[in-house]
């Protein structure tokens, strides 16, 4: 566990050039920058100019690009700065294992699994923005956090909301949790209209500012599907205790229902910096200059049930939870492959869920993972099966 909540925090950011990573650095600078945080390492992928600029600005000790072919470019960009440079999978592991009490795990996709697991095993407090650690690895990741002795602080706005309102001494009285979903840009579109949308249209989220892949996952509601599986592991819930409601305003971030009929919710303007600030300052709250809710101007809050015909990702998540085994890894691997194909224009929007369902059908009954090798094997089989369908 990180030492001393009042001391300067030593932090590594895995995925600093993505949407969550850049927002994390913005929060750090608003909370005092180098006066309150020491940055042990930053990692990125292909945006070398941004990674180098971030490392210089925040005074990082180590900068890592996941792309081994870009090592020389990053080294040149940081020449004379005194900042160490590394690349590839070994570089990501080096960043994760570097002495830092806190780690922001914001690498998108399965690429974030290995380094985040390495950080958890050494006992770092993990601010978790990577969904795949829980969707694919599930209890293996939770066990690694417990064995390492660190804390797990969710950064997804929905899970962060639940974490904030969940009364730890009353967990036995939790009846259900309700994850809210904006409905994305296609909430009111017909199936026929959705059949012809492009990636550029799908990425335009009505409320949140996010990266390309996460925005499209939100449009298909696969983002919410992954969050359902995450919530099961994070809060040790049964599948039937997890509900989803569409809430177009994205003001209520999630709710916890108790056995006495009470429902507690966390509200706020849609800004990821709120959840990031809460995680980085935990157990205290920080002072952030984000927009405040104006209830008079807001006037109303709307809720509606998700349409699982137009958005079948929800039922696929429920199926993955009920079947157990490595179906979370199968769902995610197939989804990532289908998503990449959609972005490249090789398949239509609705084909993503169709491919995932067929892959889950074909790989049903795989045993539960007993090691990360089992997780990676299931993921690879799902990706291969999806790729065969796309070819």
UniProtKB/Swiss-Prot annotation:
Its EC number(s): 1.1.1.267
Keywords attached to this entry: Isoprene biosynthesis, Manganese, Metal-binding, NADP, Oxidoreductase
Needed co-factor(s): Mg(2+); Mn(2+)
Q: Which family does it belong to?
A: Belongs to the DXR family.
- Entry function: Catalyzes the NADPH-dependent rearrangement and reduction of 1-deoxy-D-xylulose-5-phosphate (DXP) to 2-C-methyl-D-erythritol 4-phosphate (MEP).
One GO BP annotation here?
A: isopentenyl diphosphate biosynthetic process, methylerythritol 4-phosphate pathway involved in terpenoid biosynthetic process
**Which Gene Ontology MF annotations are present?**
1-deoxy-D-xylulose-5-phosphate reductoisomerase activity; manganese ion binding; NADPH binding
Q: Give a yes or no for keyword Acyltransferase in this entry.
A: no
What are the boundaries of the signal sequence? none
Q: Give binding positions for 1-deoxy-D-xylulose 5-phosphate.
A: 131, 157-158, 182, 205, 218, 223-224, 227
- Name assigned to this protein: 1-deoxy-D-xylulose 5-phosphate reductoisomerase
Query: What gene name is given for the protein in this entry?
Result: dxr
- Annotated Mn(2+) binding lies at 156, 158, 227
The entry's NADPH-binding residues are 17-20, 47, 130, 132, 211
List the catalysed reactions. Answer: 2-C-methyl-D-erythritol 4-phosphate + NADP(+) = 1-deoxy-D-xylulose 5-phosphate + NADPH + H(+)
Q: What is the lineage of its organism?
A: Bacteria, Pseudomonadati, Pseudomonadota, Alphaproteobacteria, Hyphomicrobiales
> Which pathway is it part of?
Isoprenoid biosynthesis; isopentenyl diphosphate biosynthesis via DXP pathway; isopentenyl diphosphate from 1-deoxy-D-xylulose 5-phosphate: step 1/6
Record keyword Ligase present: no
- EC top class, as a word: oxidoreductase
Q: What is the source species? A: Rhizobium meliloti (strain 1021)
């Amino acid at each position: 566990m990180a030492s001393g909540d009042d001391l300067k925090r030593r932090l590594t950011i895995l995925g600093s050039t993505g949407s969550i990573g850049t927002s994390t650095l913005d929060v750090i600078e608003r909370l005092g920058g180098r006066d309150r945080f020491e940055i042990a390492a930053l990692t990125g992928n292909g945006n070398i100019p941004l990674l180098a600029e971030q490392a210089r600005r925040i005074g990082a000790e180590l900068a890592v690009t996941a792309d081994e072919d870009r090592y020389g470019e990053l080294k040149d960009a940081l020449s004379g700065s005194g900042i160490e440079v590394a690349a590839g999978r070994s570089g990501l592991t080096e960043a994760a294992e570097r002495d830092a009490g806190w780690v922001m795990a914001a690498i998108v996709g399965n690429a974030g699994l290995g380094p985040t697991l390495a950080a958890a095993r050494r006992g770092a407090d993990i601010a978790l923005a990577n969904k795949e650690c829980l969707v694919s690895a599930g209890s293996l990741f939770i066990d690694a956090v417990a064995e390492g002795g660190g804390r797990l602080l969710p950064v997804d706005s929905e899970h962060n909301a639940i974490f904030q309102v969940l009364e730890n001494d009353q967990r036995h009285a939790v009846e259900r949790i309700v994850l809210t979903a904006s409905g994305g840009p296609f909430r009111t579109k017909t199936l026929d209209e959705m059949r012809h949308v492009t990636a550029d249209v799908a990425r335009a989220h009505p409320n949140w500012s996010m990266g390309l892949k996460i925005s499209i996952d939100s449009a298909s509601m696969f983002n919410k599907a992954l969050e359902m599986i995450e919530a099961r592991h994070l809060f040790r819930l049964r599948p039937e205790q997890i509900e989803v409601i569409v809430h177009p305003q994205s003001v209520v971030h999630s709710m916890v229902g108790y056995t006495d009929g009470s429902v507690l919710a966390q509200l706020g303007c849609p800004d990821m910096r709120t959840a990031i600030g809460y995680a980085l300052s935990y157990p205290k709250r920080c002072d952030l200059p984000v927009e405040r809710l104006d209830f008079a101007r807001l006037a109303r809050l709307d809720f509606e049930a998700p349409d699982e015909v137009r958005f079948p990702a929800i039922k696929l998540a429920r199926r993955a939870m009920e079947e157990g085994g490595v179906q979370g890894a199968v769902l995610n691997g197939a989804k990532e492959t289908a998503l990449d194909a959609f972005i490249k224009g090789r398949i239509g929007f609705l084909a993503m869920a169709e491919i995932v369902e067929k892959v889950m059908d074909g790989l049903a009954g795989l045993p539960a993972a007993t090691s990360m090798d089992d997780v990676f094997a299931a993921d690879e089989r799902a990706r291969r099966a999806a790729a065969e369908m796309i070819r």
